[in-house]
Amino acid sequence: MLLEHIHYFAGIVFIAVAALLPIIDPFAGAPIYLAMTSGLSPEERARTAKLVALNSFLLLLASILIGAYVLDFFGVSIPAVQVAGGIVVCVLAWSLLNGPIAPDVPASTTLASADSLKQRAFYPLTMPLTVGPGSISVAITLGANPPRNLRALLTTTLAHVVGVLITVVAIYLCYRYADRLVRRLGKTGTNIMIRLTAFILLAIGTQIIWNGARTMLVGVLHPGVAATAPAAAAAPRD
């Protein structure tokens, strides 16, 4: 019985990490994070990385636990979230694609206040750069059908907490040491990687918009067609 619960717990953790980490992709986002915090000192950048990780943890966990209920309360569908969020991602990606990569401003001249760091850490660094509409949609899907068995519900919730924690640790490490990655790439390599990542981010935003719009169109043209979700791990028996 214990082995069955351990297997179920590990399966939920694996599903959460496997679903969230690839779509967030903090390694690819690290150069963009560094470019958007180029005016900060190394200490401020490290502090901001912690704030982004904390914000990401709270946002992802809230999306898993109550995201479906919040959307249902306001009458908002996941496709609507995808379309709106995809537009925000596209706007951010477009500004990165066409804007300056790193302004030549010494870090010592741009000491940011705590409030300023918190604001920047949430928008745009946490949302939509790190936790965008795609990862929020995935998180909501992960928590959309909680088990009715109390023990299984507690196990699932704890597993989701662990899965999100593993994901945000990866986010923190990639952002915290983004400067080392960029140093290895050099200025030209960093410029190329940021532009390429911004273009990929633009394509992802466009795809997210299309996914949401296509689901809406299917609902209008074929109202009887129900979207099917991937099967979740089976809850262990008491």
Report the location of each language-model feature.
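Low-complexity, proline/glycine-enriched hydrophobic segments characteristic of transmembrane helices
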Residues: 1, 214-238
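Juxtamembrane helix-boundary/capping and inter-helix hinge elements in multi-pass membrane proteins
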Residues: 35-46, 79, 114-117, 144-152, ...
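Transmembrane-helix boundary and interhelical-loop signature of multi-pass inner-membrane proteins
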Residues: 41-42, 62-84, 170-214
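Small-residue-enriched transmembrane helix starts and helix-helix packing motifs
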Residues: 1-22, 99, 106-126
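Transmembrane helix exit motif
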Residues: 88-110, 204-215
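Membrane helix-loop-helix hairpins that form the core translocation module of multi-pass transporters
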Residues: 46-100
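Structural signature of hydrophobic alpha-helical transmembrane segments
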Residues: 12-29, 78-88, 157-171
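Juxtamembrane transmembrane-helix termini in multi-pass membrane transport proteins
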Residues: 12-64
